[in-house]
A protein has these predicted regions:
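Accessory RNA-recognition modules of RNA-modification enzymes
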Residues: 1-225
Length: 225
């Protein structure tokens, strides 16, 4: 399905309630029996934070291309392409000329990746269709923009803000919500800040190294990561 687009018609407060129910259900069924949640009351201790904006926040999207060359989101549990209506969660302007009645056409059977980076630059690339459950990193054609997107993430530690630049292909994974990278980095610097006998941190998230600066700053600025 279209992921967040399927969810966008629901009021934000209701979305948050549904997500909380899903999360607490999973934790209760799968984590609680192990004992890792001992002393933790899911009804009281689970904190929530809503990232703004709640609509029009997605900075990157992967589209399918139908036999007629028109791009769009896929229907739920189907390979059919919805080419007439753009996803409501994509940031304004990202899909202009890409999806809709007057949009351009692309190579049938390919996938189109659209990214709007921190500088406001739109990148549109064409790739081969990915196999189910896999990501395609190879760019076949650059339609607009560059081979690399630039993301700038501010990290605040003890009132001092530093900005970190990340440059990587539009096909690489990055948090889709425009506010997510800075928010998640803030949680790491807040929760992980401490005095450590051995300054070694593990970024198990991987990717392009989004959390390396926040881990480093939380551990005193000179850890091994």
């Amino acid at each position: 399905g279209a992921g967040c687009c399927d969810y966008s018609h629901i009021a934000p407060a209701a979305q948050q309630r549904f997500k909380r129910e899903v999360l607490t259900g999973q934790l209760t069924n799968h984590a609680q029996p192990s004992g890792v949640l001992n002393g933790f009351d899911l009804a009281i201790d689970l904190e929530e934070e809503t990232l703004e904006p709640t609509l029009g926040w997605r900075t990157r999207v992967r589209l399918g291309v139908g036999p007629d060359g028109r791009a769009g989101m896929r229907k739920a549990r189907s390979n059919d392409i919805l080419a007439d209506v753009a996803c409501a969660q994509v940031i304004p302007g990202a899909l202009e000329g890409i999806v809709g009645p007057d949009a351009r056409t692309f190579t049938p059977g390919t996938e189109i990746i659209v990214v709007v980076d921190s500088t406001g630059q739109r990148h549109v690339v064409e790739t081969a269709k990915a196999q189910r459950g896999r990501r395609v990193e190879q760019i076949e054609t650059v339609i607009e923009g560059d081979l690399d997107a630039t993301e700038i993430v501010p990290v605040d530690v003890a009132g001092q803000v530093q900005e970190f630049d990340y440059v990587f292909p539009p096909t690489a994974f990055w948090q889709a919500h425009r506010a997510a990278p800075a928010t998640y980095s803030r949680y790491i610097t807040d929760w992980a800040a401490d005095e450590y006998e051995q300054a070694t941190g593990w970024d198990l998230y991987g990717g392009v190294g989004l959390f390396v600066p926040s881990i480093s700053m939380a551990m005193g600025g000179r850890p091994r990561i």
